[in-house]
Amino acid sequence: MMGQFLMSTRIYTGEASLEEIEHLGLKRAYIICDPFMEKCGRAGELAAMLNGAGAETRIFSEVVPDPSIEVVAKAIQGMKEFEPDGIIALGGGSAIDTAKAAGHLYGSMNGEGRPLLAAVPTTSGTGSEVTSFAVISDTKAQAKYALRDQALVPDAAFLDPRLTSSVPPAITADTGMDVLTHGLEAYVSAKADDFTDACAEKAIRLVWEYLERAVLDGSDME
């Protein structure tokens, strides 16, 4: 049986890895996040970092849980006005899915393709920063639509543990169990192969060894 393994996202990991975002060479960066990320200052800090590297920035902070068609449309309208050469998703799965869907549709509309897309996750568990999927909700029809396209895969992901150090212990535990579940699902998948097994086994082992420590002490960077 033929299989394939593709990982096209450039992943930056470790403390201070977010600082590498300055080297993306962006001139106009469009930051997508939820209201809390702007209120707590995370979005502003990211914007300042990009400004220091010579980029103009705009923050779209209207992301909601289970992102809706309406929110995606608003994000696209903001892109039309700002004309970014890069989109930065800051937050959890909802922010990343909003950025993926909006960026892809914006690129299709302008005829020039999607701008560079980078993900800066502030929680673990979804893995949306490296997948070709996005889920968007239709509030009127009370339905969810799963989008799948290779163009939805972010170009870069910044996994900086400093962004998760202040997450409440209960959230750390919940998202850690998400990681464990995804690892187990991948391992028993009918489409599993040697490459995916290696990733799944490592994920399971890391959760087993370190989740409790992370829950007890969010500042433990190991």
Task: Describe the role of every protein-language-model region.
Residues M1-G86:
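ATP/NTP phosphate-donor binding region
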Residues E22, A47, R58, A73-I76, ...:
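Predominant activation on well-ordered alpha-helical scaffold segments within soluble catalytic domains
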Residues M79-T122:
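A short, small-residue-rich loop immediately preceding and capping a beta-strand
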Residues G107-F195, A203:
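A glycine/threonine-rich phosphate-anchoring loop and its flanking beta-alpha core
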